C-alpha cells in the first residue's frame, strides 16, 4: 500500500524537468529495474534554493524524486552530501519493501548532486581560499 503523500507526488510531481546552469548535478541508478534519477541543484550561500529532477522509472521512484526536491530545498550542501536513504523514504511516508530502491536511487542522486556542487564551489574558490 502506498501512502497518500507518495500518491500525491506521483499524480502531481513537483519540480520535474531540467535546470539551466545548475550548480550541481547528480545521478542515481537501480539497474535491476533500470530506474534512473538525475537531480539538479541551484545553490546560494551553501544552501539549496532550487532543486529539479528528471527520472525514468517506476511510479514510486518518480514520486520519491518529486518529494526529494522538496526535501532538498533550503538544506545545506554538506547535509545533503550525507543524506540517508531512510530520510528520503520518510518524505513519502514509507515504501513497500520491494519498492525501497526508489529511496536509494533518489538519495544517491541527491548526494551526488550535493557533492558535485561542493566540488564546483571549491574549484571556483581556488586552492588559496580552500
Question: What is each of the regions a protein language model found here?
Answer:
Residues 1-20, 25-27, 49, 75-130:
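C-terminal binding/interaction regions
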Residues 2-4, 31-32, 53-55:
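Short acidic/polar alpha-helix capping motifs at helix-coil junctions
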Residues 60-75:
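Alpha-helical support elements that line or immediately flank enzyme active sites
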Residues 33, 55-64:
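Short, thiol/selenol-centered motifs that function as redox-active sites or metal-ligating centers
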Residues 45-56, 93:
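Immediate flanking context of iron-sulfur cluster ligation sites
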Residues 21, 34-36, 48, 63:
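Short connector loops at helix/strand junctions that flank enzyme active sites
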Residues 30, 35-45:
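Short beta-strand elements
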Amino acid at each position: 500500500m502506498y501512502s497518500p503523500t507518495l500518491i500525491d507526488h506521483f499524480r502531481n510531481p513537483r519540480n520535474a524537468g531540467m535546470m539551466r546552469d545548475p550548480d550541481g548535478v547528480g545521478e542515481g541508478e537501480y539497474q535491476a529495474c533500470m530506474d534512473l534519477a538525475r537531480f539538479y541543484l541551484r545553490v546560494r550561500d551553501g544552501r539549496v534554493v532550487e532543486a529539479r529532477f528528471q527520472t525514468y522509472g517506476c511510479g514510486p521512484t518518480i514520486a520519491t524524486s518529486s518529494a526529494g526536491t522538496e526535501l532538498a530545498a533550503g538544506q545545506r550542501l554538506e547535509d545533503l552530501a550525507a543524506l540517508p536513504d531512510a530520510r528520503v523514504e520518510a518524505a513519502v511516508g514509507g515504501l513497500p519493501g520491494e519498492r525501497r530502491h526508489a529511496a536509494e536511487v533518489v538519495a544517491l542522486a541527491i548526494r551526488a548532486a550535493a557533492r558535485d556542487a561542493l566540488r564546483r564551489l571549491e574549484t571556483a574558490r581556488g586552492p588559496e581560499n580552500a
